[in-house]
From Swiss-Prot:
Protein name: Protein YbgV
Gene: ybgV
Induction / repression: Expressed equally in exponential and stationary phase in rich medium (at protein level).
Other observations noted: This gene overlaps ybgU on the same strand in another reading frame.
Length: 10
């Protein structure tokens, strides 16, 4: 889950 938040490519 943290990966999704940490993966801020925007």
């Amino acid at each position: 889950m943290v990966d999704k938040f940490n993966n801020s490519d925007c």
